[in-house]
């Protein structure tokens, strides 16, 4: 089972995690207080836990995405940032993470200078393909 939250603090309990399938994944990204704290999620049996906070291991935060997405959109003067562009950025991010870097405790570095460069071309190509690029 997978939980991806960007909702409200404390809405997931350890007891809820215990009802999930083995090796559950929880991305509790509500800020500043996550849906469940990492220690509580692990106590419930979660295998992978990430939050949006830099003071917990395995931070997953939108701060990682903004620079690359906006740079790519600005460079082609995109009139919109559409779903296709976001998917292109997501795929580029997934390709950036090596097997050696990926672990249960670290999906990727919270601030990674490679991200913006990795996303530029796929994002720009997607903007052009979907007709939102003006350059």
Where are these regions (language model features)?
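Rossmann-like NAD(P)-binding element
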Residues: 1-30, 34-35
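Adenosine-phosphate binding glycine-rich loop
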Residues: 28-135
